[in-house]
Amino acid sequence: RIDSGQPFGVVVDYAHTGEAVRKVLEVLRVVCRGRLIIVVGAAGERDPGRRFGVARAAAEGADYAVFTNEDPRSEDPMEIVREIGAFAEGAGRRRGEDFLELEDRRMAIREALKQAGPDDIVVVAGKGHEQSMIYGEEQRPWDDRQVARDELSKLGFEA
């Protein structure tokens, strides 16, 4: 949980499969008095079925989703994001109304935080404790927790 004095919850979680995303959303739904917003993606060069599972869990369990990049490896990051979005549409969600697709994970986190209002909960899922993002063969420093804190600070919230 990230607390920088904002009037909504922010949770960073490692959930990166459909089942894990479903479970974290189910648990948070019980305590959420507003909207449940999720930032989530799917890793490249992994079982493509995970993309469907993540999209379906987000479509069914969250009120709003921002689909984004998560360890794309050698795959085109935006292609992965669009595929997740297409699965969400197949589950009845509307692009632009129920979900957004943003390749840049920082921008996706920022957008989710900007969308949040009092009593909402923003879940940043998929990376959790991990300290890097994988592009091709390169591991670049990355920390969802720190990015969420940085973006909350830019929105005027300080711990």
Where are these regions (language model features)?
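ATP-dependent carboxylate-amine ligase
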Residues: 1-159
